[in-house]
A protein has these predicted regions:
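Terminal, low-structured helical/coil segments at or just beyond the last alpha-helical repeat
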Residues: 30, 306, 311-348
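Helix-start (N-cap) detector for alpha-helical repeat units in TPR-like alpha-solenoids
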Residues: 28-30, 63-64, 98-99, 132-133, ...
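Residue-level recognition of tetratricopeptide repeat
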Residues: 37, 71, 106, 140, ...
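Structural marker of alpha-solenoid helical repeat scaffolds
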Residues: 58, 93, 127, 161, ...
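N-terminal leader/linker segments that initiate helical-solenoid repeat arrays
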Residues: 18-53, 57-59, 63-68, 77
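Bacterial N-terminal signal peptides
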Residues: 9-17
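Structural signature of tandem alpha-helical TPR/SEL1-like repeats
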Residues: 41-54, 75-89, 110-123, 144-157, ...
Length: 348
């Protein structure tokens, strides 16, 4: 799963920073901190950084200001090294600052330091065991590192805390499906689409699992829901077209393949299947054009030459062009015995 790392601002109750004679300095530092917080919410990152540096200048032992400054550096200015330093300073001043450990872990992820990221996220969870964002980030980290067992465990822990966590439901369902645990995956994804009926990826994954199980009616409905939720979902349109073609629903299938190539003009397989459908519809000119486009896109696609050869042989009754096309199919590694026999007999 491929998610963008986003640093989050923790809601921190500052209270009374200092007592007695230093209260005015504390108030001044807090004023700049609150000003920085407001500027962050407005997207004014340069101004926010300046306000927070003033707060720290007035009150050097101000962990919340360092933490927010780290967020500004990371999110607003992409100064990741400076962000990491700010989070480390916040942690130095407040070793129980779970949010600072969490955001430091996210910075390490962006910097490509997975070991360090894991350490910081675990520290955040040691302080705050029910820290959902940290648990989710840790699960994603494990998944990116292909540590599927650890990822499954982390996602399961998160769902135990929050059963309606949509990202975790999808991620764990995806992992289970990749491990061949189809029923467990289906259960999670079904829960997800009940919570969010327009979750296109969940519908699509349910469709692919149903298709693998040869439950084509179920797969068809899932793909239809996927494209309804996301009309530009290329693979869902393609898979739906393939199922409709297998059912003999030629015009709806052709429409799905046309939509596919409109969305992704270099989708050779979609052009090839569109050619098959056109041939079955006796739209021979359109079929030939679709096959030729397939070969233009994928000149070494043996299956495209096979289908074009069949088209010439059976639909156009053009044995000469069929033979030329079949020869190219065999040159590219095709192994169909009937085609091999035809080409062999001509040579003799």
């Amino acid at each position: 799963m491929r998610s963008r790392v986003v640093l989050t601002i923790a809601v921190v109750a500052l209270g009374i920073l200092l007592a007695g004679g230093a209260s005015s300095a504390a108030d001044e530092a807090k004023k700049y901190y609150n000003q920085g917080m407001q500027q962050v919410s407005q997207g004014k990152y340069e101004a926010a950084a300046e306000s927070l540096r003033k707060a720290i200048e007035i009150r050097p032992k101000f962990p919340e200001a360092y933490h927010l400054l780290g967020i500004v550096y990371a999110n607003g200015q992409r100064r990741l090294s400076d962000a990491a330093d700010a989070f480390k300073k916040a942690i130095e001043l407040n070793p129980s600052f779970a949010e600072a450990f969490y955001n430091l872990g996210l910075v390490y992820q962006v910097q490509g330091k997975p070991v360090e990221a894991e350490q910081e996220l675990k520290k955040a969870l040691a302080i705050h065991p029910k820290y959902e964002e940290a648990l989710f980030a840790l699960a994603q980290l494990y998944e990116r590192q292909q540590a599927s067992g650890s990822a499954v465990e982390a996602y399961a822990q998160l769902l135990a805390l929050r059963p309606d966590h949509q990202e975790a439901l999808y991620a764990l369902g995806y992992l289970y499906e990749s491990q061949g645990k189809s029923q467990e995956a289906k259960d999670l994804l079904t829960r997800l689409v009940k919570l969010r009926t327009d979750h296109a990826d969940a519908h699509y994954l349910l469709g692919t699992m149903a298709e693998k199980a040869n439950s084509l009616a179920e797969a068809e409905q899932a793909y239809k829901k996927a494209v309804a939720a996301r009309p530009d979902f290329v693979d869902a349109h393609y898979n739906l077209g393939f199922i409709l073609k297998s059912k003999g629903e030629l015009e709806p299938a052709a429409q799905e393949f046309r939509t596919t190539v409109k969305l992704k003009p270099d989708y050779a397989e979609a052009y090839m299947n569109l050619g098959v459908v056109y041939a079955l519809q006796h739209k021979f000119s359109e079929a030939e054009q679709a096959y030729e486009e397939t070969i233009r896109l994928r000149p070494k696609m043996a299956e495209a030459y096979y289908n074009l050869g069949v088209f010439y042989e059976f639909h156009m009754r053009d044995t000469t062009r069929a033979l030329v096309t079949y020869k190219k199919y065999l040159e590219l590694g095709g192994t169909d015995e009937r085609v091999q026999r035809i080409v062999r007999e001509v040579k003799q």
